[in-house]
């Protein structure tokens, strides 16, 4: 069983979604199936088929979440330190073309959300950042072309 890194916050979100799907969504879908079944002929019962499909999707996601929870290796970022970028680091960098400041935390694949400033450890930017430190410059090949960033801050929070 291959483990993957995850922050405590990301792990809690996974467990929260799993609980919701098991304790709220599953009973709601079962009730919808029972209600649709009460309408009679199942062969042409769109409500029944929609509820069964929702059940299948929900159970699939529950299985996926159970697997992720079992394989997660929780890394408490607040206990990390150092002057080199690694998993969990929050990095401040300046785009050398636009002088725009960007702040990203490097997290596990399952908890990445660029809009929230969390990038996957397997993303091109994170791969370029790993092992670097303040003052270093990285080059990232993105779909829109190559970008250069100067690392101006590094912390573990």
Swiss-Prot record:
Pfam families: GreA_GreB, GreA_GreB_N
Keyword DNA-binding set for record: yes
Family indicated by similarity: Belongs to the GreA/GreB family.
Coiled-coil region: none
The protein's role, per its UniProt record: Necessary for efficient RNA polymerase transcription elongation past template-encoded arresting sites. The arresting sites in DNA have the property of trapping a certain fraction of elongating RNA polymerases that pass through, resulting in locked ternary complexes. Cleavage of the nascent transcript by cleavage factors such as GreA or GreB allows the resumption of elongation from the new 3'terminus. GreA releases sequences of 2 to 3 nucleotides.
Keyword set, alphabetical order: DNA-binding, Transcription, Transcription regulation
UniProt-listed Gene3D superfamilies: Transcription elongation factor, GreA/GreB, C-terminal domain, Transcription elongation factor, GreA/GreB, N-terminal domain
InterPro entries, alphabetized: GreA/GreB_C_sf (IPR036953), TF_GreA/GreB_CS (IPR018151), Tscrpt_elong_fac_GreA (IPR006359), Tscrpt_elong_fac_GreA/B (IPR028624), Tscrpt_elong_fac_GreA/B_C (IPR001437), Tscrpt_elong_fac_GreA/B_fam (IPR023459), Tscrpt_elong_fac_GreA/B_N (IPR022691), Tscrpt_elong_fac_GreA/B_N_sf (IPR036805)
Domain of life: Bacteria
A GO BP entry: regulation of DNA-templated transcription elongation
GO molecular-function term, one example from the UniProt record: DNA binding
Protein name: Transcription elongation factor GreA
């Amino acid at each position: 069983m291959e483990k993957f890194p995850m922050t405590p916050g990301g792990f809690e979100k996974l467990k929260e979604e799993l609980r919701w799907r098991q304790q709220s969504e599953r009973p709601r879908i079962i009730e919808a199936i029972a209600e649709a079944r009460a309408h009679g002929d199942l062969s042409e019962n769109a409500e029944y088929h929609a509820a069964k499909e929702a059940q299948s999707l929900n159970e699939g996601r529950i299985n996926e979440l159970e697997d992720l929870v079992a394989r997660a290796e929780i890394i408490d970022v607040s206990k990390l330190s150092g002057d080199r970028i690694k998993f969990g680091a929050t990095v401040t960098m300046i785009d050398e073309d636009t002088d725009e400041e960007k702040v990203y935390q490097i997290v596990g694949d399952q908890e990445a959300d660029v809009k929230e400033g969390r990038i996957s450890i397997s993303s091109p930017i994170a791969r370029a950042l790993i092992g670097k430190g303040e003052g270093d410059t990285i080059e990232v090949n993105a779909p829109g072309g190559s970008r250069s960033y100067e690392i101006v801050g590094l912390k573990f929070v």
